[in-house]
Amino acid sequence: MNSFLQLKNISKHFNTRKKIKVLKNLSYNFDKGKMYALMGPSGSGKSTLLNLMSLIDRPSIGSIQFDKNIVNFDNNKKNDLFRAKNIGIVYQENNLLSDFTALENVYLANLSIDNDKEAASTKAKTLLKKIGLSNRLNHFPSQLSGGECQRVSIARAIINDPEIILADEPTGSLDLNTAKEIFQLLNNQKNPNRLIIFATHNRFFADKADCLLEMTNGSVKTINV
C-alpha cells in the first residue's frame, strides 16, 4: 500500500494568554486509494489537522511528508504551487467567490497552474455539466442553493485532478437528502491514485469511509479499517 501522506510527531499549539495545545504528538500514515473520515467533538483538532495537511498552516512541532518528501514550511511559493496542483479543498460553508459565476469559480482554480483561459473554461464547463450543473454555469453563488454551491466547490477542488481531496464538514450545513447527494459526489471522486480525507460529525457518512479515525484531546486513533 502506498502511504502517500505521512504525519510524524505533529503538535500544534496557539499562543493566546495561555498556550493551547490542539494537536499532541500525532503520527499517522494515509494511503492513496482510500477515503478517511475524521470524527470527534468540536475542538478536538479536526479542522486544525486539515489546515496542516493542506499546507494552509504549519505544525508547531513535527513533520509532514508527501510521497516521502518532507514539507519545508518556509518555502511558501513552492507550497502554494504544490497545493494548487495536488490538493483539492472543500469547506463546509460557502467559500466561493461571490462576484464570480459558478463557471468562473471553477476555471479560476485551473488558471492558478495553467494560463490558458479558454482551455480552463472548457474544462470547467465539462466538469460542471458532468455533476449536474449545466444550467447553472452563469449563476452567481447567491443564486445557487446550498447543495449547488457544494457541487461547485467539489468541481473547483477536482479540476486540477489532485492527488488529495480534503473536505471539512462538506455536508454539515445541508439537509439530509442533499447531504447524501453531496457525499455520494465526493465518494465518486475516489480512485487508486487519490487520497480523500473528510471531517464530519455525522456517523452515517463516517461509516461509509474506508477508514474511520476518531480525534480526541489532540490525538487520533483508528476505529475501523
Model features per residue range: what roles?
Residues M39-P41:
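The feature captures the beta-strand-to-loop junction immediately N-terminal to the Walker
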Residues S54:
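Helix-to-loop junction immediately C-terminal to a conserved catalytic motif
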Residues F140-Q150:
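Conserved ABC ATPase signature
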